[in-house]
Every structure is written in structure tokens, then in C-alpha cells.
Amino acid sequence: MARLKARYNDELKAKLQEELSIKNVMEIPRITKITLNMGVGAAATDKKLLDGAVADMQLIAGQKPVVTLARKSIAGFKIRDGWPIGCKVTLRGDQMYEFLDRLISIAIPRIRDFRGFSAKSFDGRGNYSMGLKEQIVFPEIDFDKIDRIRGMDITITTTARTDDEGRALMRAFGFPFK
């Protein structure tokens, strides 16, 4: 079992139940999935850029990403309907907790000039979205082997009903907010 999952089941559930004054154990907020998305805008002109993004995402997430396609043609962005423009991975279960553990304990401390994530990035239903400017903060990525620095979006979906519940859950996991 993942270290963070065991910690959640052993310590954090009881702490959250007391903090949020929840009576039913099934109402305690938990993380359901983590979605990683890497948009590669230049993939419309150079298809090899997408291969590098897919390889990086596979190293970071530990599973093969799905290539995302453009939903409609936009002349201003020079993309057509159905063209590959990025990749995404959805993590659940033990892989999700392993990734979250690596993100909190290894990757976030390696971000340059980091002063904490914004606590305003919740969507109103307890889900948190954030962006990373470079993929090299993850130890799986070898700096010498990457073709270019890419950013990514990370969305953490929870069962929390409000932003305050989601914020309490993320803080309990040790997420650094401003």
C-alpha cells in the first residue's frame, strides 16, 4: 500500500472528521483521481514534439498517456479538427497516491523561487488545479535527455463538497499553500 494512502487511512481520516465535524465516515473528503495534462501547442507543426511530451509524461506518471486531439479547427492557432495537440494521464488508486507523494515530497521542493501554491485555485467544489512551468522538477526526468522544457497542468479531484473541505484535505496531506 502506498505510504500516503496508509497515512490517510490511519491518521488523516480521524483528524479530518474531527476538524470538519463530520458524523458519517463516508462523508470524509478523499482524493478520487489526479489528472496530468500536457498541451503541446507546437505539435500542430512538428509531430516529433508530441513524442517527447508523451515520453516525459510516461516517465512522470508511470503509465502510458492518451494523446489528446483538437476538438475543432481554429485558424488563429493553425490547428485542424482531429490533430494531436497534447497528452493526458488519469491516475487512480495506489498510483495516484504514489504520484502525490512524489509531488509533495520531491518535486515541489525542487521548484525554483517557490513560495507556496495559491489557495484560490479551487473550483468551488473542492477540486484543485495547478500548473507546473517545467517538467524537470520530477527526478524521473533526466535534464540532459529532454528536447525542450514543457509545463503541465495537474488537477486533483476530490469528494469534498466545498472549497474549505478540499483545502483542509490538501493541507492534511502536506500541500504547501501561501
UniProtKB/Swiss-Prot annotation:
Among PANTHER family, the record links this protein to: 60S RIBOSOMAL PROTEIN L11-RELATED
Entry-linked PROSITE patterns? RIBOSOMAL_L5
| Species assigned in the record | Acinetobacter baumannii (strain AB0057)
Family per UniProt? Belongs to the universal ribosomal protein uL5 family.
Please give the superkingdom of this protein's source.
Bacteria
How this chain assembles, per its entry, is: Part of the 50S ribosomal subunit; part of the 5S rRNA/L5/L18/L25 subcomplex. Contacts the 5S rRNA and the P site tRNA. Forms a bridge to the 30S subunit in the 70S ribosome.
Question: What keywords does the record list, in alphabetical order?
Answer: Ribonucleoprotein, Ribosomal protein, RNA-binding, rRNA-binding, tRNA-binding
Any one Gene Ontology cellular component term annotated for this protein: ribonucleoprotein complex
Q: One GO molecular function term?
A: rRNA binding
As for what it does, the entry says: This is one of the proteins that bind and probably mediate the attachment of the 5S RNA into the large ribosomal subunit, where it forms part of the central protuberance. In the 70S ribosome it contacts protein S13 of the 30S subunit (bridge B1b), connecting the 2 subunits; this bridge is implicated in subunit movement. Contacts the P site tRNA; the 5S rRNA and some of its associated proteins might help stabilize positioning of ribosome-bound tRNAs.
Q: Name one GO biological process term.
A: translation
What name has this protein been given in UniProt? Answer: Large ribosomal subunit protein uL5
